[in-house]
Amino acid sequence: MNIILMGLPGAGKGTQAERIVKEFDIPHISTGDMFRAAVKNETPLGLEAKSYMDKGHLVPDEVVIGIVRERLSMDDCAKGFLLDGFPRTVPQAEALTATVKELGREIDHVININVQREQLIERLTGRWICPVCGASYHTMFNPPKEAGVCDKDGGKLYQREDDKIEVVTQRLDVNIAQTQPLIDYYSAQELLRDIDGEQDIQVVFAEIKSLLRG
């Protein structure tokens, strides 16, 4: 079972990825992990990727695809895989389709965990941290007893720069613009399945499981 998992920041993709790979006994393959492993193992493609990254340049698609191909060729992918964070563009998606085909396989499912923009903003801007003890709170999921104050030591909670609404909104809008062409691409291939990510975590996973077993 070969799966691509899509979802914007805050959609709960990481949580569902963990559950899927455990349920179906397939490896969770993220681009970050792939790159780190290739660089650490000093594979020719890993070293080539590192030379671009060291200069602050984007790694060319052909190198990225080469690293993906190496990873998908490993023994632990024999029963399938879950790809997370790749592809990011339509050319990468086309190259991935060709690569998987060359390996005698195909992409079976593309799952998009769908959450409305306003809900994502609320999720992503809800984290507040205590400067004294480092405790983390969330206004939606784990609020302090008194707003803005740490339960443990009374420290005044603060918000990281990355969690502020201006930064979150900009990051989300960039992601939405990048993701839409991929959604269109996989929709046209009749591979894409939208899952409502605004439901309870257990319900989201139950729907994904039902889809994959169907």
Swiss-Prot record:
Protein name as it appears in the record: Adenylate kinase
Q: Which PROSITE patterns match?
A: ADENYLATE_KINASE
Which interval of the chain is the signal sequence? none
Family note? Belongs to the adenylate kinase family.
Q: Which PANTHER family match?
A: NUCLEOTIDE KINASE
Q: How does it assemble?
A: Monomer.
Binding residues for ATP: G10, A11, G12, K13, G14, T15, R127, S136, Y137, Q199
Q: Where in the cell is it found?
A: Cytoplasm
Annotated EC: 2.7.4.3
Alphabetical UniProt keywords? ATP-binding, Cytoplasm, Kinase, Metal-binding, Nucleotide biosynthesis, Nucleotide-binding, Transferase, Zinc
| SUPFAM superfamilies xref list | P-loop containing nucleoside triphosphate hydrolases
Region (LID) residue ranges read 126-163
| One cellular-component annotation, GO | cytoplasm
Q: What is known of its domains?
A: Consists of three domains, a large central CORE domain and two small peripheral domains, NMPbind and LID, which undergo movements during catalysis. The LID domain closes over the site of phosphoryl transfer upon ATP binding. Assembling and dissambling the active center during each catalytic cycle provides an effective means to prevent ATP hydrolysis. Some bacteria have evolved a zinc-coordinating structure that stabilizes the LID domain.
Reaction(s) catalysed (UniProt annotation): AMP + ATP = 2 ADP
- Region entry NMP, spans: 30-59
Q: Which GO terms describe its biological process?
A: AMP salvage
Q: Which GO terms describe its molecular function?
A: adenylate kinase activity; ATP binding; zinc ion binding
Q: Give the pathway annotation.
A: Purine metabolism; AMP biosynthesis via salvage pathway; AMP from ADP: step 1/1
The function of this protein is:
Catalyzes the reversible transfer of the terminal phosphate group between ATP and AMP. Plays an important role in cellular energy homeostasis and in adenine nucleotide metabolism.
Q: Which amino acids does the record list as binding AMP?
A: T31, R36, H57, L58, V59, G85, F86, P87, R88, Q92, R160, R171
Q: Where does Zn(2+) bind?
A: C130, C133, C150, D153
